[in-house]
A protein has these predicted regions:
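Generic structural signal for small/hydrophobic residues in well-ordered secondary structure
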Residues: 13-16, 23, 44, 60, ...
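Mid-to-C-terminal secondary-structure elements
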Residues: 120-133, 146-273, 472-656
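Alpha-helical transmembrane segments of integral membrane proteins
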Residues: 1-21, 268-270, 300-337, 341, ...
């Protein structure tokens, strides 16, 4: 019987080639789109779940009352790890992680750049990064021990055994390779190419004991069977015991496996995070697949009259409804199987471009039995979902009516078909509106005034002898006409690396724990960056040696500190008094989507990490770059000149939203294509079923235009209804998404009008092809048997 079902199903697919092509193509595209999204979702939800002890691993977080609301963050002071290990026996191990900028690594005459982390020796014991060479308990057990990833080791040493080899880091210290670790998987929050033991930090006197300096990430691993709720309760008083400046701050543990997706807090409560995007695209995947299945349902029911006699005869000879349903479901599963093969081909072809778009390394794991099981289940579910309604409908025909030729599509068939078309285009219109709004939000942020001049502004990290030779480099850049101004800062102008809630000033409320961004800068800071000075002056150590104790503050800081005359005020920070010499206009330091925070810029003598260079715009960019390269090579010969243009770095702030916008655009386009395929097939069958009516109308003088109008108007009504339903749904969804951005665009009426008009035009073009074809047909052929 099964063999017979398969033969019948195959014959039906071959007999109706156009029907089969539209269904297989539409379902294949829908399945491919859903598979791509599901691959991405699987990657997102699997973050940090490969660790053997994942259920016992936690990040250490802080919770504090800031301006009446609870703020949460995962930056911790360096001494906290030792305090936790000492005071809480329920915690088995603790590890700190400090991030490093890309550092130059020298092996013989060869130079490389690598991204690393400074970690406690317990790091490899807590987290599942297997060692290919070396011992987990000894690899990170010395001041100059270094563990390399397999990829970096092969890049530097080729096929040689790297163990015990000496490498020079940042042209300052020699390290001994003590281990080779597997490359961190793509679903790990830890991205590194080498690991250095925390003992190096202590040796360099950087392991400061200050509880006010929240500069590292701390991780804890509980002992088996330890009760989390009990530990959480005890941790609340940790700061009270050790932190004399902020004893009211609370400490708590946050599951490592949740940090990637859920690490967003509002007023001390976990409110989501990246999981919101994951859920959104999960819904998109489901709807794309449903839309593809709707095509199958519509086309199958549309050609029901063609198969009515088959059903009638089979029922007369004894076929049961159950066996007919099984046959029709078998046909849809067979079609889904072919569509699934097409989907796999599409996914394989699209994956490289898709990975580039989302900045991932996703792949189909054909060696995994789980993959094939999931694929089979996916195809089976798609086939059953697509074929369930047509199977039930076709199997319900009454043989007497069918064999008398009395079967006509009434409301029982037409109404569900209309609902399905409306559903398709409702979702398509929602996606079109969402795509436009996302792009508007990105454009809104891009158009926001940064407050400084990005053009011709270059920065370079101070590595090697740059800081030592800073004055010589600066003078030569200016003398050569390459630059018009040069300054050094603690961080790039596009980033905020430090903040504090412990600053003091006259009139400050003791309960005020406002977080203030901290920045350090040198002479010509304002001139180089193009910031606007509201009052006072720029740093000028040459004419004002006391500027090493001077500070600039922004307008938001003036409001926060309630200064009526800010210039001359004294601010205490980092155990030092700073005299305000000027006020700068607010500028975007961090996210362009967020409000500008109060900012304090210290004219310190130390803490410099970056040199900013304002290039001479009278020279060609290539000439300026060549000149800078030669000057830096002269004074810092052991390092490559790795410069960055500020405008390009600032543009990277929009990458996530741009990626979301591109994905929304892509899947909106696919949704429209799938919907139009179904509409094309449906209009073809509608024209075929009304061919005699069209013939009569043409004989009576109807024009091609009137025929097109006749066949198109019903579809256009459905699109209009879909637009009416989609508009409030899209408004609600996008308003909810935009609520996460304090600096956001408005949702304009013309977005909805444009999306609706686009949907109508696309549908009209799709239907018109078949309508024009029917309108231009010869009525004699349609009426010759009448």
């Amino acid at each position: 019987m099964i063999r017979n079902f398969i033969i019948i199903a195959w014959r039906n697919l071959v007999r109706k080639k156009s029907f089969s092509f539209i269904n297989i193509t539409g379902l294949g595209i829908g399945m491919a789109a859903a598979m791509l999204i599901l691959l991405w979702i699987q990657n997102e939800v699997s973050y940090d779940k490969f660790h053997t002890n994942k259920e016992r691993l936690f990040e250490v977080w802080n919770r504090y009352n800031v301006e009446g609301s609870l703020g949460c963050w995962n930056n911790t002071p360096k001494p906290m790890a030792a305090a936790i290990q000492q005071d809480y026996p329920e915690i088995e191990k603790v590890a700190r992680v400090s991030f490093l900028p890309p550092l130059q690594i020298t092996v013989g005459e060869k130079k490389f750049y690598g991204r690393g982390r400074i970690v406690d020796s317990t790091f490899l014991q807590m987290f599942s990064f297997p060692l290919l060479k070396g011992n987990v308990n000894e690899a990170l057990n010395g001041i100059y021990s270094i563990v390399l990833t397999d990829k970096l080791a092969k890049t530097m040493f080729g096929n040689e055994d790297p163990m015990g080899k000496t490498i020079r880091m940042d042209n300052t210290d020699n390290f001994i390779v003590s281990g080779i670790v597997t490359n961190p998987p793509y679903n790990s929050q830890f991205e590194f190419e080498f690991l250095i033991d925390w003992a190096y930090m202590r040796h360099k006197d950087r392991d400061d004991p200050y509880w006010s300096n929240n500069s590292v990430t701390t991780y804890a691993m509980l002992k088996p069977g330890a009760l989390l709720s009990s530990i959480q309760s005890k941790l609340k008083t940790l700061r009270k015991k050790y932190d004399k400046e902020d004893p009211g701050m609370e400490t708590f543990l946050y599951p490592l496996t949740r940090s990637h997706l859920y690490g967003k807090f509002e007023n001390g409560i976990e409110t989501g995070g990246r999981i919101e995007i994951v859920r959104l695209f999960g819904i998109i995947a489901a709807f794309i697949l449903i839309i593809a299945c709707i095509n199958f349902m519509n086309l199958s029911t549309a050609r029901s009259e063609k198969r009515a006699k088959e059903v009638g005869i089979r029922k007369v000879v004894g076929a049961q409804k159950k066996s007919l349903i099984t046959q029709f479901l078998g046909e849809s599963v067979l079609l889904a199987l072919i569509a699934g093969i097409l989907a796999l081909i599409i996914v394989e072809l699209a994956l490289p471009a898709f990975n580039t778009l989302i900045d991932k390394k996703l792949f189909l794991d054909y060696s995994s039995g789980r993959f094939w099981l999931m694929l089979f289940a996916f195809i089976l579910i798609s086939g059953i979902l697509a074929g369930s309604y047509p199977a039930i409908y076709l199997s319900s025909f009454k043989p007497v009516r069918v064999l008398k030729g009395n079967l006509k599509a009434g409301n029982a068939l037409v109404t569900p078909r209309k609902i399905l078309v409306i559903t398709q285009f409702t979702f398509a219109i929602v996606l079109i509106i969402a795509t436009i709004v996302v792009r508007q939000q990105i454009q809104k942020a891009q158009d926001r005034q940064t407050g400084y001049s990005k053009d011709n502004l270059v920065y370079h990290f101070m590595e090697g002898t740059v800081e030592k030779n800073y004055t010589l480099i600066k003078n030569e850049l200016l003398a050569s006409g390459t630059a018009v101004s040069v300054t050094k800062t603690s961080a790039p102008i596009t980033e905020g690396w430090s903040n504090s809630w412990g600053m003091e000033w006259q009139g400050k409320d003791p309960e005020d724990k406002t977080t203030i961004d901290r920045f350090c800068a040198d002479d010509a800071f304002i001139k180089t960056t193009g910031l606007q000075l509201v009052e006072g002056r720029d740093f000028d150590l040459k004419n004002f040696p006391t500027d090493s104790n001077a500070a600039l503050i922004n307008e938001s800081a003036v409001k926060t500190m309630r200064f009526k005359q800010p210039v001359g005020q004294v601010i205490k920070d980092m155990g030092q008094e700073w005299h305000v010499i000027g006020v700068i206009k607010d500028f975007v330091l961090k996210s362009p989507y967020q409000p500008i925070e109060p900012m304090f810029v210290a004219g310190a003598k130390a803490w410099f990490n970056v040199i900013h260079i304002k290039l001479n715009n009278k020279n060609a960019t290539a000439k300026n770059v060549a000149s800078m390269t030669a000057i830096f090579k002269k004074y810092n010969p052991d390092y490559e000149f790795n410069y960055r243009f500020t405008d390009k770095e600032y543009a990277k702030k929009f990458n996530d939203e741009k990626r979301t916008g591109k994905l929304a655009s892509l899947f909106a386009l696919l949704t429209i294509i799938i919907s139009c395929l179904g509409l094309f097939g449906l209009s073809s069958y509608m024209a075929e079923n009304r061919i005699k009516e069209i013939g009569v109308r043409k004989v009576l003088g109807a024009s091609v235009g009137s025929i097109v109008s006749l066949l198109s108007k019903d579809f256009l009504k459905l699109i209009l209804i879909a637009f009416i339903i989609a508009s409030p749904i899209a408004w609600w969804a996008m308003n909810k998404w935009l609520s996460g951005f304090p600096y956001r665009t408005a949702i304009y009426w013309w977005v909805f009008a444009g999306a609706g008009l686009a949907a109508i035009l696309i549908a009209l073009l799709t239907v018109s092809f078949q309508a024009i074809k029917a309108g231009m047909s010869n009525p004699v052929k349609a009426l010759r048997t009448e």
